[in-house]
């Protein structure tokens, strides 16, 4: 609300500069699609998809099907980002983006995008880390079982 009521579309206000380079700007943009404007014009699909993701994640968290705090935190960030962008899509028909980092030539984005991306990355990292731990534990258990069987057969041979 602050951005679209106080700025003109495409207007940019430098926040952090180094020399002649504006590193961080508040730039008012509207995005009728998803990330990088993909699925532009597919508002109904984006609204329904986002709503389904939010409902599924809330169900998984509230029904206690997901118990690990790291998963819950990650999913909460995804839900928060989804709700933020969903509100924009329903009210405005598009998402208001305003964070413009120019040290890398990157798309303008918003706080909801940050939440969704950090949540998705966190969930991915935690799931992969847990899978690696589980595989290591299975290998250790196999080695322990195999060592125990060797010791048992050695003792039986005596």
Predicted regions located by residue number:
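Alpha-helical transmembrane bundles and membrane-interface segments of multipass inner-membrane proteins
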Residues: 1-158
